[in-house]
């Protein structure tokens, strides 16, 4: 009896010593094709209004299009966010300083002393002002943040702005001081600067903040570059087929970017990949012939004798790719099976979901982006606490419930 009481006392003491970690789990909507976005529904403002935010680990600032009024704005699903003067963040506010630190620019403020900004993206730009408002976000510890700073974008310098898009704007999830994740941690909503996403090939998936959902085993981990503002495992070597030699002339600088629908390789690894894929098709699957796709984003496609419905119909014609990251004597391999780089178009063609970054995005300058298509059916974890990037095969169409780390450990 005395021994049992002692054991119980020890367990209670352990619970007091282990800091409670909380988790936020959010359902994802969308798909790689044809929607081209994975997004969450976020309720913002008081009273709250719903917005679709594209999850983007390649962007720092979360922002909405704003009726301030809005110039050159895109056609989006919901009514534009309308700020009030009380919501504006001033130039003197530390949040404004943090924003410009994240952007890597000297702080410049307009005559009204509000925190103005301009963000340049690969294919567009956004001009706006920093605001604060309520985000209705529930966590496993019951905490609900009062205010979150985000961008109020009132001028979008983007082509084809008259074309409707399926999302209202961006949920910035990269490393930085004004990211949503950093603000949630500073408010005590989560205790660890950890996030992850799980994108399902069936569509949808989930996003989580905090470390409570991270599996205790089976994850392939590799160090992240501590100095990089993006989530980069450094340089990786590209292989075609499991037993082949490297097809990249040199290790490739890699960034994991959930905001990129497709995967983008620099010119040399892209041409090498295209060459070996075509060579395999010419020798083993001559019934597939190259064709021009109506969707201009899909630059390399093949058609069969009949309309192709699923990747399984042509999977035997393609080989797996892999990226190998070295950390001393340790190696971490990201397997890229055909279903993680191929797309079946609406025309019934099979298309390469790896694009030439040197042509599509001229500013990439040799960087290779691992986009959503290559992260399908895997839990991808960005652990800034330990500077580790991890991935593990996962059934992403099953959304876990939010629970505290203490519960998951016992």
UniProtKB/Swiss-Prot annotation:
The record lists the organism as: Oryza sativa subsp. japonica (Rice)
Q: Which residues form the active site?
A: 56, 257
* GO BP annotations listed: proteolysis
Output one GO MF annotation.
aspartic-type endopeptidase activity
**Keywords, in A-Z order:** Aspartyl protease, Hydrolase, Protease, Repeat, Signal
Signal peptide annotation: 1-23
- Its Enzyme Commission number(s) read 3.4.23.-
The domain of life is Eukaryota
**UniProt xrefs under Pfam families:** TAXi_C, TAXi_N
Q: Can you tell me which family this protein belongs to?
A: Belongs to the peptidase A1 family.
Alphabetized InterPro entries for the sequence:
Aspartic_peptidase_A1, Aspartic_peptidase_AS, PEPTIDASE_A1, Peptidase_aspartic_dom_sf, TAXi_C, TAXi_N
- What is this protein called in UniProt? Aspartic proteinase Asp1
Cite the Peptidase A1 domain residue spans from the record: 38-392
Specify whether Repeat is a keyword of the entry: yes
Q: Which residues form the propeptide?
A: 24-46
Enzyme class, first EC level, given as a word: hydrolase
């Amino acid at each position: 009896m005395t021994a049992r009481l002692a054991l119980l006392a020890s367990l209670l003491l352990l619970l007091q010593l282990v800091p409670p970690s909380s988790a936020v789990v959010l359902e994802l909507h969308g798909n790689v094709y044809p929607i081209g976005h994975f997004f969450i529904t976020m309720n913002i403002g008081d009273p709250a209004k719903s917005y679709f935010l594209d999850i983007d680990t390649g962007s720092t600032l979360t922002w909405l299009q704003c009726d301030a009024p809005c110039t050159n704005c895109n056609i989006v699903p919901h009514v534009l966010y309308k700020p009030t003067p009380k919501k504006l963040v001033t130039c003197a506010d530390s949040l404004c300083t943090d924003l410009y630190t994240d952007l890597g620019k000297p702080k410049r403020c307009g005559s009204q002393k509000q925190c103005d900004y301009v963000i340049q993206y690969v294919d567009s730009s956004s001009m706006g002002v920093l605001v604060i408002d309520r985000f209705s976000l529930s966590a496993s510890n019951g905490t609900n943040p009062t205010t979150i700073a985000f961008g109020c974008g009132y001028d979008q310098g983007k082509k084809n702005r008259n074309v409707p898009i399926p999302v209202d704007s961006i949920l910035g999830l990269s490393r930085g001081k004004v990211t949503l994740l950093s603000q949630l941690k500073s408010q005590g909503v989560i205790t660890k600067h950890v996030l992850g996403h799980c994108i399902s090939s069936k569509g949808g998936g989930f996003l989580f903040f905090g470390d409570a959902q991270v599996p205790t085993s089976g994850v392939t981990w590799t160090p992240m570059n501590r100095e990089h503002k993006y989530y980069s495992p450094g340089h990786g070597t590209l292989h075609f087929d499991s037993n082949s030699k490297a097809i990249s002339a040199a290790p490739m600088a890699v960034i994991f970017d959930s905001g990129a629908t497709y995967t983008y390789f620099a010119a040399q690894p892209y041409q090498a990949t295209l060459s070996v894929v075509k060579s395999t098709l010419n020798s083993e699957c001559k019934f597939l012939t190259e064709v021009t796709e109506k969707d201009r984003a899909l630059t390399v496609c093949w058609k069969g004798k009949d309309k192709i419905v699923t990747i399984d119909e042509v999977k035997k014609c393609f080989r797996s790719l892999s990226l190998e990251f070295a950390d001393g004597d340790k190696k971490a391999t990201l397997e890229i099976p055909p279903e993680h780089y191929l797309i079946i178009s609406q025309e019934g063609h099979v298309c390469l979901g790896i694009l030439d970054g040197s042509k599509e995005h001229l500013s990439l300058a040799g960087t290779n982006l691992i986009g959503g298509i290559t992260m399908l059916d895997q839990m991808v974890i960005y652990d800034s606490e330990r500077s580790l990037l991890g991935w593990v095969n996962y059934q992403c169409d099953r959304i876990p419930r939010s629970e505290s780390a203490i519960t998951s450990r016992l």
